[in-house]
């Protein structure tokens, strides 16, 4: 079967009409918009809890970006801080964060943590956010020692 025929079949296979009708009704009745509104409120709460937990880190050569949208934010750290080691320390405490330097291709001076909050329950952020903040504070202080 050619790629064109497979694609044509996938786009027009039987059974999709019922799903499309159900989805159209879901949207028309306002359920989709309601779901989106609830999700936005949930993620805003999580983002705010994470920002509150990380507040003690700010001002010590650290700042946050990515708070306007998305399901993660970036905690930018000084260029001479080992963000890979810091991410590993967080992992050792059961926290999942990513080293910003792992995402940099053209620059070798970017350091920080990419912190996702979309999958984490609010209670976990409230409990574990301060743990992450303490790890960051310790790394910032030891960098100067």
Name each region found by the language model:
Residues 1-40:
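Conserved core segment of the aminotransferase class I/II
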Residues 28, 76-78, 118-120:
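Residue-level recognition of strand-loop junctions within catalytic nucleotide-signaling folds
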Residues 41-51, 62-76, 86:
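Conserved glycine-rich beta-strand-loop-beta hairpin in the small C-terminal domain of fold type I
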Residues 61, 101-105:
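Short, solvent-exposed loop/turn elements at beta->coil junctions and helix N-caps
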Residues 81-86, 123-127:
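Short, conserved charged micro-motifs
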Residues 92, 106-145:
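PLP-dependent enzyme catalytic core of the Aspartate aminotransferase-like
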Residues 96:
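Residue-level detector of anion-binding/catalytic polar loops
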């Amino acid at each position: 079967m050619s790629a064109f025929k497979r694609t044509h079949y996938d786009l027009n296979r039987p059974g999709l009409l019922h799903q499309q009708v159900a989805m159209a009704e879901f949207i028309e009745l306002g359920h989709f918009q309601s779901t989106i509104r609830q999700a936005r409120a949930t993620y805003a709460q999580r983002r705010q809890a994470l920002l509150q937990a990380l507040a003690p880190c700010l001002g010590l050569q650290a700042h946050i970006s990515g708070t306007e949208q998305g399901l993660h934010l970036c905690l930018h750290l000084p260029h001479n801080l080992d963000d890979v080691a810091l991410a590993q320390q967080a992992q050792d405490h059961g926290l999942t964060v990513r080293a910003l330097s792992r995402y940099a291709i053209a620059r070798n001076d970017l350091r920080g943590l990419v912190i996702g909050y979309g999958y984490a329950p609010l209670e976990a952020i409230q409990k574990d956010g301060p743990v992450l903040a303490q790890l960051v504070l310790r790394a910032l202080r030891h960098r100067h020692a």
